């Protein structure tokens, strides 16, 4: 367990905490909203700058780094492969600024114990914690037996084709950990289906009825359990003859069956259905080896007995054959900002520095 290295970890933080914070701020100042390809830069110049920043920093810290055709960067602790590979994953791309911001969205401001700016929470702060976790091993000479790597992506907020490309080239790890959630661990993500129903007549009454059915019961995708969570279905847009829906449902219902049930509903109502987005979810028991280890580590470090949870969002974790999410946010944190501010994707996105340092200790 990491407790064996408590002294080394805390001494490392004393030396490098301020440097880590400054590097998060510098990365936040790169407005890396993924865009169209520009020359050799697959996701635009700013995303390329963010990847280059991470690659350069990794090399400065004595780590090994490789650019995977601008889809992302792989950072390695060891030059040569080892038997078991543990892959950490985070991303540099961000969603565009939104809402009324008190602080410059790409300012990388430190105030009231927070790093403020777009991407500080999602996912540049956690990314730097992971990078410095690898640097810790290099700096102290502590040598994990596993082949420890970090994937730095640049298209997570769009479609996660970046990590798909990387995994196709590098292969699946023995276990993957995405740092794009809240602690303690995310041990599953729900299936995601976006779909559009089209009719030849006005269906406003039916749309209202389906909008009220927030659990997808009429579509035949409702399920609820303590283990896998509960289905949710939201009407995204509509007019008289069409409506678009965003469905999130547990992996206890195969995604193919969910599609079949939606198609059946459409047929019964003389409608056409078009699936706009499809992402298969995952589940791993928190009692399994690595998830259980991570959960115990979290509880020992924080003194909290929080439980593992299933999320409706989508992260790199669903792209692993086996893996989970682990931090770096604090669930239900009350931040000292106006209502609606401070969260990921919101105005004045703000990463709690103490929470980030605690994440680094656990990584």
Which residue ranges define each predicted feature?
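Active-site-adjacent substrate-binding region
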Residues: 214-218, 225, 281-330
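Generic non-transmembrane alpha-helical segments
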Residues: 12-19, 23-30, 53, 57-61, ...
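Short beta-strand
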Residues: 64-68, 274-275, 309
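Active-site metal-coordination/substrate-binding segment of hydrolases
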Residues: 83-152, 341-342, 346-358
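Zn-dependent metallopeptidase/amidohydrolase metal-coordination segment
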Residues: 12, 304-362
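Midchain, well-structured core segments that form catalytic/ion-binding scaffolds
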Residues: 155-157, 161-266, 279
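Acidic/His- and Gly-rich active-site-bordering loop/insert found
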Residues: 2-115, 144
